[in-house]
C-alpha cells in the first residue's frame, strides 16, 4: 500500500502569479496527461516496486480534479496488480488539507509487514506475526552488506532526502569508474526501462480513469 498526501494545491495556486511550481505542474502542455499521478504517484509506484522487487502489471484508477478550473487531476485512488499475484493500492492527493509531504509505504505479507514514512525517514517499523513490533533505525544495529558505504553520518543524526540523490550520483560515478560491485549497483539504479515503465503506469492510470476505472494492462500502452 502506498499513500502520498500533499495539501499545497488545495486552492488554485497556479493562478496566483507567484507559484511557478504550481503553474507548470498543472499545465498539460508542460507536465503531460496526468497531474498528481504523474507528479507524486509516479514516485510512489516506483518506490513500491523498488522495495518489493515486483512490477506493476495492471491498474484500475479513479482520477479526480477537485479544484474548479484545474486542467489535471489533483487526487487519485488506484488499485494495482503486480506479478506473483500480489495486489495493492495507491492513495494520491495534492489537496489533502494539512498535509505537507506525507509519503508512506506499507508492505504486508503472510508472516510480517514493513512500514516506512518519508517524513520520518530514519525509522522503519517491522511487524512479525506473534512478536512485538520492531523499530529499525538507519545506521542502527541491523545492517546488511548493501548498507555499508551508504550511511554517511552516525545513527541518530537525521539523514534522508538530499542524501538519497547523492547516493544515486555516487553509485553512477562508481559504475563509470568501474569500481566495486558494478552489477549489484546497476540493479539498484533506475534506468531508461524504469522510466518507460513508470510512464506506462501513468498513462494506464489516465486511460483507466477515462474508461470508468476499467482494469488496464501496462503492456497495452
Listing of model-derived features with the role each one plays in the protein:
Residues 14-21, 25, 50, 58, ...:
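C-terminal glycine/acidic-rich active-site capping loop/insertion
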Residues 44-45, 168-173, 202:
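A general structural signal for well-ordered alpha-helical segments in protein cores
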Residues 198-205:
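Alpha-helical scaffold segments in carbohydrate-active enzymes
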Residues 1, 207-221:
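C-terminal capping/lid region of NAD(P)-dependent oxidoreductase domains
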Residues 57, 88, 182-187, 211-217:
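Core catalytic loop region at the nicotinamide-binding pocket of NAD(P)H-dependent oxidoreductases
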Residues 1-70, 124, 212:
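Predominantly a Rossmann-like dinucleotide-binding segment in NAD(P)-dependent oxidoreductases
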Residues 38-113, 118-122:
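Glycine-rich, aromatic-lined ligand/substrate-binding cores of catalytic
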Amino acid at each position: 500500500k502506498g499513500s502520498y498526501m500533499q495539501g499545497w494545491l488545495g486552492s488554485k495556486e497556479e493562478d496566483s502569479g507567484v507559484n511557478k511550481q504550481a503553474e507548470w505542474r498543472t499545465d498539460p502542455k508542460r507536465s503531460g496527461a496526468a497531474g498528481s499521478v504523474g507528479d507524486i504517484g509516479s514516485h510512489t509506484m516506483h518506490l513500491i516496486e523498488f522495495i518489493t522487487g515486483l512490477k506493476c502489471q495492471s491498474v484500475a484508477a479513479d482520477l479526480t480534479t477537485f479544484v474548479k478550473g484545474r486542467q489535471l487531476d489533483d487526487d487519485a485512488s488506484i488499485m494495482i496488480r503486480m506479478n506473483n499475484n500480489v495486489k495493492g493500492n495507491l492513495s494520491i492527493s495534492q489537496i489533502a488539507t494539512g498535509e505537507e509531504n506525507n509519503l508512506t509505504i506499507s508492505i504486508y505479507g503472510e508472516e510480517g509487514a514493513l512500514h516506512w514514512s518519508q517524513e520520518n525517514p530514519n525509522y522503519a517499523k517491522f511487524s512479525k506475526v506473534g512478536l512485538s513490533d520492531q523499530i529499525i533505525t538507519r545506521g542502527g544495529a541491523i545492517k546488511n552488506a548493501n548498507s555499508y558505504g551508504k550511511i554517511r553520518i552516525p545513527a541518530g543524526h537525521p539523514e534522508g532526502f538530499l542524501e538519497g540523490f547523492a547516493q544515486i550520483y555516487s553509485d553512477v560515478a562508481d559504475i563509470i569508474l568501474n569500481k566495486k560491485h558494478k552489477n549489484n549497483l546497476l540493479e539498484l539504479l533506475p534506468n531508461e526501462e524504469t522510466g518507460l515503465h513508470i510512464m506506462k503506469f501513468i498513462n494506464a492510470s489516465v486511460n483507466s480513469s477515462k474508461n470508468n476505472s476499467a482494469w488496464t494492462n501496462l503492456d497495452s500502452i
